[in-house]
């Protein structure tokens, strides 16, 4: 607790100090030779909006100015400038984060979206992407070159940003986490130094970046290994969308529990607990994928089909078209920015039907008693971990390779933040999060850091066994905590030396 308080006090001091700095004059100083395409913007301009708009507007940071660097050299310049003048800043790619960042007020936004290059090397079976590249920008190029890569569930987040926290997704069972595909990266540290990191170069920092990377610098580019389509069913995927009504959810959850550790590595599911505005009741919108022959996929999904869901739509698509197809194309909806979302999240290493049903029932009661929460929903991701756990636990900083399920309870109130319905949703979120722990398979609440709300302990996000090494890295590469707004690490921890 004392470590968290000290970090908060340091961040508060930086925010207060920023108010006394004339950021506009600082950024527009004539002696600074920014690249011609670098954009500097301030409030009430379209450029500023483009550089700062966030997927989640709840408890969001605020900025006095923004810079959109055109290249790595300008990233170095702005980091040095901000550190020299004690200006708090946050570097972002797709700005699709879950974590509350209300502590950062009137800071500097470093928008990396212009550094969005990508290059596929077919001979080496790699792709190199820039800091602001999103999966949606380069997935087709990878496919057309004859490859595929593990990714998250939507196309709009910055690909590198997802990687820095671990990178779970539908392909975790066959390819592992995104960090398991990472070969090397270039990172700008707090001193403005550019380092190449890999298993053979700055290897200890490379270890820490794979699971807590946003604590050590700004990654300007990264190279990943690709997987041949020819080795993976030519990249063809069976995708199946189902609508499961309230009276059949327990049967569906029983099937999920029966999978347990037997779920095949080439299958994955996302189940959305949502309100049916026509039937005026809860339902589950589920998408399941099977990376393999269509007949095998249909056999795997036969227990769901036997439930006779109210909707069942199956199609066979190339992997690069999955996100735009799955869930009736809900990927685009999940990328809509600006909504005030309060999120409560959790993870598990086993599926329990009773917990899933109790969660569904509690949210149903919430919909019934608070009509303003009709757009409130819960996503439950079921991703097998075969390839993830095949990597030794101590190979990377990521601590939760044994997890196979993730909850994301998303509170959106039509009546606005602070309304009775919003507050009821927040209370329900606390209750639900506590209830998930009991059957999660973990002794305490744990969370994939990219899904962290921000109120979790260090141990719940990073794992107690990883923290000594992580704290030592933080002390070495960012002792002043300039990269301290996104689930910050301490510079001291028992055993860190």
UniProtKB/Swiss-Prot annotation:
Domain FAD-binding PCMH-type: 59-229
Domain of life according to the entry: Eukaryota
PANTHER family linked to this entry: BINDING OXIDOREDUCTASE, PUTATIVE (AFU_ORTHOLOGUE AFUA_1G17690)-RELATED, FAD-LINKED OXIDOREDUCTASE AFOF
Family membership: Belongs to the oxygen-dependent FAD-linked oxidoreductase family.
Cofactors that this protein relies on: FAD
EC numbers: 1.-.-.-
One of the Pfam families matching this protein, by short name: FAD_binding_4
Gene (name only): fogF
Signal sequence interval, chain numbering: 1-18
Pathway note: Secondary metabolite biosynthesis
Disulfide cysteine pairs (residue numbers): none
Broad EC category: oxidoreductase
Function in brief: The PKS fogA releases the carboxylic acid (8E,10E,12E)-3,5,7-trihydroxytetradeca-8,10,12-trienoic acid as its product, as well as derivatives with one and two double bonds.
One GO molecular-function entry: oxidoreductase activity
Name recorded for this polypeptide: FAD-linked oxidoreductase fogF
InterPro entries xref list: BBE (IPR012951), FAD-bd_PCMH (IPR016166), FAD-bd_PCMH-like_sf (IPR036318), FAD-bd_PCMH_sub2 (IPR016169), FAD-linked_Oxidoreductase (IPR050416), Oxid_FAD_bind_N (IPR006094)
Keywords: FAD, Flavoprotein, Oxidoreductase, Signal
Mutant lacking the gene: phenotype: Leads to the accumulation of the prenylated benzyl alcohols produced by fogH.
């Amino acid at each position: 607790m004392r470590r968290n308080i000290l970090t908060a006090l340091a961040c508060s001091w930086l925010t207060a100090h920023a108010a006394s700095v004339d950021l506009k004059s600082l950024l527009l100083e004539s002696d600074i030779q920014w690249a011609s395409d670098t954009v500097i913007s301030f409030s009430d301009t379209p450029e500023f909006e483009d550089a700062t708009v966030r997927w989640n507007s709840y408890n969001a940071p605020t900025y006095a100015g923004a810079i959109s660097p055109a290249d790595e050299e300008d990233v170095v310049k702005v980091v040095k400038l901000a550190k020299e003048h004690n200006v708090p800043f946050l570097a972002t790619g797709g700005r699709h984060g879950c974590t509350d960042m209300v502590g950062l007020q009137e800071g500097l936004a470093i928008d990396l979206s212009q550094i969005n290059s990508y290059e596929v090397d077919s001979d080496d079976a790699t792709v190199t992407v820039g800091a602001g590249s999103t999966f949606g920008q380069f997935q087709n190029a990878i496919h057309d070159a004859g490859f595929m890569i593990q990714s998250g569930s939507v196309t709009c987040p910055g690909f590198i940003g997802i990687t820095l926290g671990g990178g779970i997704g539908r392909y975790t069972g066959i390819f592992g986490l995104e960090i398991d595909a990472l070969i090397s990266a270039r990172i700008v540290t707090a001193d403005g130094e550019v380092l190449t990191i890999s298993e053979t170069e700055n290897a200890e920092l490379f270890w820490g970046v794979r699971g807590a990377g946003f604590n050590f610098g700004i990654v300007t580019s990264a190279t990943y290994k690709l997987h041949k389509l020819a080795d993976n069913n030519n990249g063809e995927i069976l995708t199946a969308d189902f609508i499961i009504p309230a009276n059949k959810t327990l049967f569906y959850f029983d099937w999920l529990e029966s999978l347990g550790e037997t779920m095949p590595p080439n299958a994955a599911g996302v189940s959305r607990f949502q309100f049916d505005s026509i039937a005026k009741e809860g339902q589950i919108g589920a998408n399941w994928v099977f990376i393999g022959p269509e007949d095998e996929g249909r056999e795997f999904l036969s227990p769901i089909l036997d439930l006779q869901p109210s909707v069942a739509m199956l199609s066979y698509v190339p992997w690069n078209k999955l996100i735009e197809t799955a869930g009736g194309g809900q990927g685009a909806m999940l990328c809509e920015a600006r909504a005030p979302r309060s999120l409560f999240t959790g993870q598990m290493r086993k599926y329990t039907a009773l917990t899933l049903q109790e969660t569904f029932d509690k949210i149903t009661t919430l919909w019934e008693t608070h009509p303003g929460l009709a757009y409130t929903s819960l996503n439950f991701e079921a991703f097998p971990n075969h390839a993830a756990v095949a990597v030794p636990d101590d190979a990377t900083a990521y601590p939760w390779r044994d997890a196979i399920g993730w909850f994301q309870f998303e509170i959106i109130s039509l009546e606005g933040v602070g309304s009775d319905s919003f507050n009821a949703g927040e209370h329900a979120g606390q209750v639900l999060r506590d209830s998930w722990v009991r059957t999660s398979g973990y002794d305490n609440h744990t969370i994939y850091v990219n899904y962290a709300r921000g109120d979790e302990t260090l141990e719940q996000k990073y794992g107690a066994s990883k923290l000594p090494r992580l704290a030592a890295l933080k002390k070495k590469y960012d002792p002043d905590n300039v990269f301290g707004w996104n689930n910050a690490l301490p510079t001291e921890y028992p055993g860190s030396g």
